[in-house]
Amino acid sequence: MSKTRVYELAQQMGIDNKELMARLADAGVSVKNHMAVLEDSDIKALSAPAQTPHKEVSQEEVRVKPTLIRRRAKAVEPEAASAEAASAPAAQEEAPQKAEPEKVEAEKAEAPKPRQAAEPVRARIIEAAPVPKPAAAPAEAAKPEKAKPAEPAPVAAAPKAAEAPAAPAAEAAPAAPAPAEAPVAKPAAKLEASAPAAPAAPAAAAPVEAQAPAKAEEQEPEKATPTRARILGRVEIPIPAQRPAERREYQRTAPGERPAPRPGMPRGVERPGTERPAPRPGGPRPAGAPGRPGERPTTGRPGGPTGGRPDRPAPLAPIDAPPLLGDDRRKGRKPAPAGGTDYAKNGKKGAPAAAGKGKKDSFKDILDKRERVFEPGPRSKGRKGKYEKVQIGKKTEITVPKAIKRIIKISESITVGELAKRMGIKATDLIRALMKLGVMATINHPLDFDTATLLATDFGYEIENVALDVDEILEAEPDTPESLLKRPPVVTIMGHVDHGKTSLLDAIREANVIAGEAGGITQHIGAYDVELNGKKITFLDTPGHEAFTAMRARGAKVTDIVILVVAADDGVMPQTREAVNHSKAAGVPIIVAINKIDKPDASPGKVKQELMEFGLVSEEWGGETIFVEVSAKKRINLESLLEMVLLQADVLELRANPDKPARGTIVEAKLDKGRGPVATVLVQEGTLKSGDYFVAGVHYGRVRAMQNDRGEKVLAAGPAMPVEVIGFNGVPDAGDIFVAMGDEKQAKEIANHRQMKLRESELAKHSKLSLEQLYEKIQKGEVKDLNAIVKGDVQGSVEAVAESLRKLSTDAIRLNVLHASVGAITETDVNLASASNAIILGFNVRPEVKAAALAEKEGVDVRLYNIIYDAVDDIKKAMEGLLEPTFKEKYLGRAEIREVFSVPKAGMVAGSYVTDGKIVRNAQVRLLRDNMVVYEGKLGSLRRFKDDVKEVATGYECGMSLENYNDLKIGDIFECFEMEKVAGKL
């Protein structure tokens, strides 16, 4: 099924889009605008002939192309004439009804008629179809009403034997009664007679004459040849004179008739003898086919009433139109604009246009048509208002996207440039809108969801947040009561440093872990599995040093029971208080283990009393807290402590579902040189198996292997079981949630999303200085920076060291941890330190050979530590070295002026007596007069009995002079002092 748009059909017919839409509306075909698509059925409805019986008798249809139907008449000339005569009487009966409203047109048309100059226009049309006048008169009188129904059809029918003769008559009949018709026909006949004189006239007339449809078929291929254009050109200068009159007639149509096309559209008149393609073949030709006997003289070109409306359809359907339509299709519909422009040009300039010029001006004609389509002009005033509204609405439809396209999906943030691209506007417009909101932005400036929504609303768009909802994806599934099974308790040992936490755990595990810790203090979280009487207990050992607060907080969060270790000889200490607070914040029950009871100065009662301040009251004293007195060294009461742990676990009724994907917590993580990133994972629910995909923080991976705290390989880890997992793509942070995933793609997507969010938050922290901040910085003096790179053996230690260093920052000096990671010191770290003037701190790690050589070459300070105390102290000293030293005044002594002498070349010299301290040469001195400072400067000379001396002690006399000052008087006091440098302190 072929589909043709309204504007294409209008171009083929050579009429205005509005007029075609009006015809379609009259034919019952509803179209919204000139871009609407017409089906074949719509075109047939539009082109339905007024005299259907004649169509059936006289024509046969042949489909030449999907979009072209060629109708050919079966009858010969005599048949056409007889059909014409037959239709005339019927038309004559109806003519009187229409004649009255169209008399006005007749009167208007008759005024220009005497001007013979205008008649060649008709002559051109008639020239193609010289017909006996007697036949025309009755036809003209007969056809007005029959032709009217066919008028709305923009598509002219191919040659119709019966209908074609009737149509030309229709044009003439509305014009006026027969008397008006006669004068018109006579000049036409005269011109007709003169036309053959031209050499090309016979060639043109013969095909158009078309007394039989067969002739019309023969002439069809010739329609596209230049001879047609030359025939048009042969119309002499009289055309210009008639053209304006015709235009006026077009504009002043009778109220009952549809408005004529604007003057720029004379293509319809010109079509019979030009290259102008006929409209779609299926349409009726209200004006009749050219060449019908007796019809041509009445073609309403000269007649006013006829020239208004009916005149237009006549040229739309010349007999030879179908071939031209084919040519038009092949040539991109250029012939139609060419012919019409040619005629318009003749009308304006008064000179016949050559065939070549017609083609040259086709582009202008196209532009003219576009103006009529898109810009309602003064000639559209007479049209129905609804068509103009359609045109205005059409502009809005073209410029405003559909509602579904006005929704922009973003993932939490979007750059200005990307937002502008998606909205189809310029980025500068968005930047201008942001500036109005007080935001100075560039094209790459990221916009958050709220700002983007605010901006998009101003431009008529909506923003939809399609960010990945990680929390929803990782949300734990609720467990049914029957799926929950009993699990071992997770116990965390907490307390102050050196109170015996690790020793107690070693005694329980019968191992010697503390021997492996540097300085005898724990600097890692350790996870261990202990079995007592067939029951398992999982222990987490946390550091007690103040720097490991985060580790203790993590330990308290993932645990079920906390064992608070307090030394009986030391009592409650700062980290003991902190451990109690962490446990209470996590809502975890506390069992107090009073350690070192074997020491002579042990005082368990004192410990119980101190802990009462924190609400930990012993059961012996009527409280609810379990206290157990133990000795890790002597292994006293260890079993009693474990029994209390199991008892507390039974009270808590600890249960978990092992038949689900594993979830847990990263207890500790490190970078192993042989195995890569390794993390200690405490499984809290579900079962972790080898081969499972997982995500932990910004890292993901697949479980390659697992082993327990004793180094044994494990294939599956159930709830409350700590295991070392190998298979991470990076070293995760301690405390990250570990979640087993169904596939690697989902795990990777979540990890990448978290990585992007982390990067955005880090960028937000490093904001640029504003002018006000910069001014304050200048006023106070530039802040000193000490950059550091921290490397450690495990993630927890690195985190603790970095946090301790950050706490050393002051207003005067700021410590920046540029990079903190797990693993040995590499060349990359040295290069970073060299570029940023940073020092490298290694905690329980050593530099690689190449890295050490590079550090020595670049002069990078690499410091290695095993104990966190030493690292913090060294950094503190380094920071103090960056501080500006302060100066302190040191008092030396006083001397009183007893006499003043004038010495040539030396100026005034004061004979003085040292009353206090000592006077030192080259020291700073103040001259006091009545306890007021008169002068402060440097001592010029110091002599005793004409000898220069370094200093003069109390009770001795001396001579002194000041540099560049001679106003000395008896009784003045010299106060001697010096300025000492004092190193800055944090």
UniProtKB/Swiss-Prot annotation:
UniProt-annotated stretches for the region G1: 495-502
Localisation: Cytoplasm
Region annotated G3, chain positions: 541-544
Residue positions binding GTP: 495-502, 541-545, 595-598
Biased segments, Basic and acidic residues type: 53-64, 95-113, 215-225, 268-278, 358-374
Pfam families with a match to the protein in the record: EF-G_D2 (PF22042), GTP_EFTU (PF00009), IF-2 (PF11987), IF2_N (PF04760)
PROSITE patterns: G_TR_2, IF2
Annotated region described as G2, given as residue ranges: 520-524
Ranges where the record places region G5: 631-633
Ranges where the record places region Disordered: 47-388
Main location class: cytoplasm
Domain of life according to the entry: Bacteria
Annotated segments matching region G4: 595-598
Family: Belongs to the TRAFAC class translation factor GTPase superfamily. Classic translation factor GTPase family. IF-2 subfamily.
The protein, known as: Translation initiation factor IF-2
Organism: Citrifermentans bemidjiense (strain ATCC BAA-1014 / DSM 16622 / JCM 12645 / Bem) (Geobacter bemidjiensis)
